[in-house]
C-alpha cells in the first residue's frame, strides 16, 4: 500500500470513529431528575427516550416513564434500546447490574455536594451529548452571576441563617452540601454548621437565634412552618420579618441554572430586609 492510499485509509478510519462517537448517545434514559433537567437546559431532550416519574419537564413531553425515584423497570428500559442509562447513587446496584448484563451502558453521576461539583457534572453531561461548548458557556455565565451577586450584599455583622428543608422532623441544611453554599454565598453563618446530621429540634433553632429563616416550599406545611416560627417573637428573624419561603423545585435541584436562580431569589429577599 502506497503512502497516499495509507493516509486516505487512516483519514476514513478516523472519520468513522468520530462519527461513531458523535452518534454514541442518541438514545438516552435518565434515572436522575436533575440530570433530566440538565438535558433540557442543554437542548438535548430529543435524545431522551426514558425518565423517572419525578422528571417534570420530560413528563410534560410525554417521555416514557421507566422508574420511580429509586426503583427502575429494567424490562421497560431494555425494550427502549438505550445507548446509555444515566443513574445516581440512589439507583439499586441490582438494577444497574441487570442492565449491564443486557449489554446496556450505565453511567453513574454521584450526588453533587458543591456548586463546583454541579458545574463539573454539567460539563461532563455536555461532553456526553456533544454539547460541551454550550455547557461551558452556561457555567461561565453562572459563575459571572455569582461574582456579581457577591458584591450586592454587604453586612456590618454576619447574619445567622437557618435553612429548613423538612418539617416533620425539622431538617436543617448542613455545611459541606451544595445547599449549604447558598448560605455561605450570601455571606451568612449557618446555625447548623457544627452539626453532623440535619435533624434538629425547635429548641435548638431558638437557642441559635437566627437572623434569617428560609424554608423550602413544601405545600401547606411550609406556610404552617412559617406561622409556627412567627409565634417565637423573641427570634431576630421574627422581629425583623425575615422568614422566607424558597421554591423547593429550584433550591433542592442540583443544576447550575436552578442554583443561580435560587441564589438570586435569596439575595433579593435578604436585601429587602437587610
Sequence positions of predicted segments:
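Structured C-terminal subdomain patch of bacterial secreted/periplasmic proteins
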Residues: 26-27, 72, 117-127, 136, ...
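Bacterial N-terminal signal peptides that target proteins for export
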Residues: 1-10
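A short, structured surface patch at a secondary-structure boundary
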Residues: 27-91, 95, 191-194
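Basic- and aromatic-lined ligand-binding clefts that recognize polyanionic substrates
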Residues: 25-39, 133-186
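Flexible loop/hinge segments that line or gate small-molecule binding clefts
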Residues: 56, 95-124
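Hydrophobic h-region of N-terminal signal peptides that target proteins for export
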Residues: 11-20
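Proline-aspartate-enriched helix->loop->beta-strand connector
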Residues: 73-90, 104, 201-218
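His/Asp/Glu-enriched short active-site or ligand-binding loop at hydrolase and phosphoryl-transfer sites
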Residues: 52, 176-198, 245
Amino acid at each position: 500500500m502506497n503512502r497516499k492510499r495509507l493516509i486516505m485509509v487512516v483519514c476514513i478510519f478516523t472519520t468513522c470513529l468520530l462519527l461513531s462517537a458523535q452518534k454514541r448517545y442518541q438514545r438516552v434514559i435518565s434515572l436522575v431528575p436533575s440530570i433530566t433537567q440538565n438535558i433540557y437546559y442543554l437542548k438535548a431532550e430529543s435524545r431522551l427516550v426514558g425518565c423517572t416519574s419525578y422528571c417534570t419537564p420530560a413528563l410534560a413531553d410525554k417521555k416514557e416513564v421507566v422508574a420511580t425515584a429509586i426503583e427502575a423497570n429494567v424490562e421497560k428500559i431494555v425494550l427502549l434500546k438505550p445507548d446509555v442509562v444515566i443513574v445516581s447513587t440512589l439507583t439499586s446496584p441490582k438494577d444497574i447490574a441487570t442492565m449491564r448484563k443486557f449489554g446496556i451502558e450505565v453511567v453513574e453521576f454521584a450526588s453533587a455536594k458543591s456548586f463546583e461539583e454541579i458545574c463539573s457534572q454539567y460539563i461532563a453531561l455536555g461532553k456526553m451529548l456533544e454539547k460541551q461548548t454550550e455547557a461551558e458557556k452556561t457555567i461561565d455565565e453562572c459563575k459571572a452571576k455569582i461574582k456579581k451577586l457577591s458584591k450586592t450584599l454587604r453586612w456590618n455583622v454576619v447574619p445567622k441563617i437557618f435553612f429548613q428543608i423538612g418539617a416533620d422532623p425539622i431538617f436543617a441544611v448542613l455545611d459541606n452540601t451544595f445547599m449549604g453554599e447558598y448560605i455561605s454565598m450570601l455571606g451568612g453563618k449557618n446555625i447548623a454548621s457544627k452539626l453532623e446530621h440535619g435533624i434538629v429540634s425547635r429548641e435548638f433553632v431558638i437557642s441559635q437565634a437566627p437572623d434569617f429563616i428560609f424554608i423550602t416550599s413544601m405545600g401547606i406545611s411550609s406556610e404552617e412552618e412559617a406561622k409556627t416560627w412567627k409565634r417565637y417573637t423573641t427570634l431576630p428573624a421574627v422581629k425583623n420579618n425575615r422568614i422566607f419561603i424558597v421554591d423547593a423545585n429550584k433550591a433542592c435541584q442540583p443544576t447550575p441554572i436552578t442554583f443561580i436562580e435560587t441564589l438570586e431569589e435569596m439575595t433579593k429577599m435578604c436585601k429587602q430586609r437587610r
